[in-house]
Structure formats: structure tokens, C-alpha cells
């Protein structure tokens, strides 16, 4: 499963880069001296830096998080969050505008893990099955999530608990994402 996720994510990033660079060149983001990333391509100019998603040489380790939660994160989630660094990536899924969530650097991965833990503990308190958010939507109460048990990708309404299956797996979801300009 991990290899399928990494391959599908790499193909999505290649499409995103090809489409974006054909339109406007490399994406730029604000440069922060104390928030560096292996995604940064050049030296900053006028407070901005060009960037690209960056595949990690070694996957991130989720052992401590798994042990703390007494829950094993789905292998697709571990591959997704632990395989690449990136800025949030705007995209479309069947007309739904969303921003894919990935860590920018190691410190951001730690923050993402904390947010995922908080999300999982909230779901546990509400007696809902565990899911891991992978993308945001324009509505802050609606997330795109990975079901930790089945690996399905859902549209999840946090306020009502309603869940709608978007794709049978993370690779299937990634293959159907449409790119948007950065």
C-alpha cells in the first residue's frame, strides 16, 4: 500500500508541477529564515522563494504516535505524511476545491502529528471511528479524511459526523485529483 500511495502522490505532483510551471513558472511562497524546508529551490528574492514538493530520503517514523494513541495509523496515512514535504497544494476532486495537507519540514511534521492526535482524540470522545484529515475544504467544518480502518477516502462533516465515501483508497483518490494553479 505504501508504494502505491507514494507512486500516486509522485504522479500527482508531476502533473501539478507540469501544469503549474506551464502556466506561471515555479510556485513562490513567503520565505521565513527560521522555517526552512528542503522544498526550497533557490535563495529568496524579495521575501519569496521558489519551491517544489520534495520526496524524503527516509520515511518519517510514526511509532511514538501509534504507541501514544494505542492505534496503528493506516499505512496509507504513514506513507502520505511521512514520504514528502510540501506546501498545501490546491486541487479539485470532482469539482470540490480542496487543499492537500502535507508537512513543509520536520517541525511542521511534528505540528501535523499533534493536530492529527487532537483530531483522533476528538473522534474517540465522540465515539466515531478514527479518521485522519488529509485535505481542507472551504468549509472549516468539512474535511477530506482517510478512514483509518478501511483506507477509504471520505468527505467528513465534523459538526454532524456525516461521512461520504469519495474513493475506495488513497491512491484512487490521488489519481482523480485535478491540479489548480498555485
Curated annotation (Swiss-Prot):
Localization in the cell: Cell inner membrane
Keyword field: Cell inner membrane, Cell membrane, Membrane
Protein's membrane topology: Peripheral membrane protein
A single Gene Ontology CC term: cytoplasmic side of plasma membrane
Function, as annotated: Interacts with the SecY protein in vivo. May bind preferentially to an uncomplexed state of SecY, thus functioning either as a chelating agent for excess SecY in the cell or as a regulatory factor that negatively controls the translocase function.
UniProt family annotation: Belongs to the Syd family.
Protein name: Protein Syd
